[in-house]
């Protein structure tokens, strides 16, 4: 769904505005300068529309139209408009960037035209700079800390004491791929990095988890089953689905076993043939600015991707930030170029395993 953030008074004011900006500025009416972008259909997307968009419109003398969606829907929007692009910037997770690049839907980001790119941690630039992360969640297990001790190793979740005590994320979600990598690491004794290429050896181990699975869940609301004591462990899940509950005092917390934690990266890409390229680059730069990065991180409890942002200790305990914390968590990002062509077959086998 496309939403136009517009009212008559704002339109008249913006049309008349010719605001000087540090870069990317050309004289034109706001009516002529319409930037269309894709944002996530989430609390984060709503926050960007409320806190970032109005100031951006005012500064650049333009209107910003937003389309809300998740990665797959946003990729579909780019395919549908390939011959006549309407978007200049599209939100997509790191998992979507290789596919978008392969299909020729996006262009590389010009490093010299987006000043804040220089502050981005290299691990959050994807596919020869065809995408950049701007918000990072951590994926691991979640528990009720009043009932379950932190999980030291993923091997523990296979213990018979957890029979019918685990919530397993649906095979439809990316998190299921992460659980397969975990099973492969346990089966082979290899690191997560190595085990992602050895998944044929992980299926038997994954099947061993079946007696412990209470249910397969496909909605964030179901994580409350752990808080209510109906289950002991859940996962693999992103921290952005858990930590907001933790902050409210609900008995839910993340647990990151010694094998490592996974990244969940929200990103941005410059659309090929972007009709408002300069405004699009300015939009990306704005979302990577220290001020916006700090605001988004504190509101959504997902880490920034740029260096040098300062947080209170209360905020930092929820974030994979700064660099030292990333290393302590043994933070790992899968090789999506390897995984994506195999994912359909894995999904089918996953469904068979847990049917």
Predicted regions located by residue number:
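N-terminal secretory signal peptides and thylakoid transit peptides that target proteins
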Residues: 1-19
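Early extracytoplasmic/lumenal segment of secretory-pathway proteins
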Residues: 32-98
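Extracytoplasmic ligand-binding site segments that recognize negatively charged/polar headgroups
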Residues: 42-49, 86-227
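A ligand-binding cleft/hinge motif common to bilobed small-molecule-binding domains
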Residues: 96-99, 232-251
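Short beta-strand->loop
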Residues: 107-115, 129-131, 158, 233, ...
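Periplasmic-binding protein-like
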Residues: 137, 200, 204-209, 238, ...
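A bilobed periplasmic-binding-protein/Venus flytrap-type ligand-binding module shared by bacterial periplasmic
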Residues: 140-147, 184-186, 264-277, 295
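Mature extracytoplasmic/periplasmic domains
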Residues: 271-330
């Amino acid at each position: 769904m496309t939403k136009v953030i517009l009212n008559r008074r704002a339109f008249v004011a913006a049309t008349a505005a010719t605001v000087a900006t540090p870069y990317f500025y050309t004289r034109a009416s706001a009516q002529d300068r319409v930037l269309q972008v894709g944002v996530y259909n989430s609390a984060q997307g709503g926050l960007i529309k409320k806190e970032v968009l109005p100031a951006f419109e005012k500064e650049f003398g333009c209107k910003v139209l937003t389309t809300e969606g998740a990665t797959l829907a946003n990729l579909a929007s780019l395919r549908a408009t390939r011959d006549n692009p309407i978007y200049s910037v599209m939100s997509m997770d790191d998992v979507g960037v290789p596919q978008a690049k392969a299909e020729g839907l996006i262009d590389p980001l010009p490093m010299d035209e987006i000043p804040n790119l220089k502050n981005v941690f290299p691990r959050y630039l994807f596919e020869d700079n065809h995408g950049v992360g701007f918000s990072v969640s951590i994926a691991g297990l979640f528990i009720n800390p009043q009932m379950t001790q932190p999980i030291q190793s993923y091997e523990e979740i296979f213990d018979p004491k957890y029979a019918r005590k685990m919530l397993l994320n649906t095979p439809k979600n990316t998190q299921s791929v992460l659980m397969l990598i975990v099973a492969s690491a346990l089966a082979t004794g290899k690191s997560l990095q190595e085990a992602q290429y050895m998944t044929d050896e992980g299926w038997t181990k994954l099947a061993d988890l079946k007696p412990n699975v209470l249910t397969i869940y496909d909605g964030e609301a179901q994580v409350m089953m752990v808080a209510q004591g109906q289950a002991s462990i859940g996962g693999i899940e992103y921290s952005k689905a858990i930590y907001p509950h933790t902050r409210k005092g609900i008995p839910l917390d993340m647990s990151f076993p010694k094998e490592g934690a996974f990244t969940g990266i929200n990103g941005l890409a410059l659309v090929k043939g972007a009709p408002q390229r300069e405004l699009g680059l300015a939009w990306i730069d704005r979302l990577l600015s220290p001020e916006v990065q700090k605001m988004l991180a504190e509101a959504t409890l997902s880490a920034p991707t740029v260096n040098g942002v300062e947080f209170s200790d209360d905020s930092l305990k929820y974030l994979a930030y700064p660099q030292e914390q990333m290393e302590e968590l043994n933070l790992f990002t899968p090789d999506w170029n390897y995984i994506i062509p195999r994912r359909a077959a894995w999904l089918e086998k996953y469904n068979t395993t847990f049917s």
